[in-house]
Amino acid sequence: MPLRLQNKLALVTAAGQGIGRAIAEMFASEGARVIATDLDDKKLEGLKSLKRRKLDVRSTASVDSFAHEIATELGALDVLVNCAGYVHQGSVLDCSEHDWDFSFDLNVKSMHRTIKAFVPDMLGKQAGSIVNISSAVSSIRGVPDRYVYGATKAAVIGLTKAVAADFIKKGIRANAICPGTIESPSLEERIKDRSRATGKSLAEVEKAFVERQPMGRLGHAEEVAALAAFLASDEASYITGQAHLVDGGMAL
């Protein structure tokens, strides 16, 4: 059976851990030529990829320069996966101006930067798939203490639909993936933060996370990566502008 992403050139941001790394690994296993980036390039060590590079997606100059480098060396991307993100915990009362600005810059504007930088070359060949990581906590569902995070992830869905509409007749598709609670280093840090804030043990906090899941378990990054591989592939050629849940029934 042929590999579904054979020879496709794919860029994955925040590929050093969690969902981003799982996507980069799955893409490589499906035959893609993966360009893996992360702000901490040490996290990219051991990752099978065509190119590994430190990239600050909050810097327009860095993203533009990197896009020019890739276009010159390798040509237009076939797939762009935007994974970089940050989870702020708290309500509107806990959200400072800095928290708001940082969250929107990393969770939303970073996607604007990469899409704006890489889409022109995709347009040149009238083909490309963009996959943006949003969340079930967004315009789909409100969750306590995810005020600015939910707002940013709702914005990601809106951004994705806008890009899909703009380029729907030019060969470029854009879709959003909306994970529920996924086992990852990011979740581990949130559990630690919650434990410190509440005085509860790590086991108690983790148990509470699991008990909130309709399926009675947390999701796995590989389950998100499987959907990303499908959306990036030609098998999904008639799918664009959608928010796809991988949430174990969280949004039911």
What feature does the model see in each segment?
Residues 91-92, 96-104, 209:
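Substrate-binding pocket helix/loop in short-chain dehydrogenase/reductase
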Residues 135:
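Residue(s) in the substrate-gating loop at a strand-loop-helix junction
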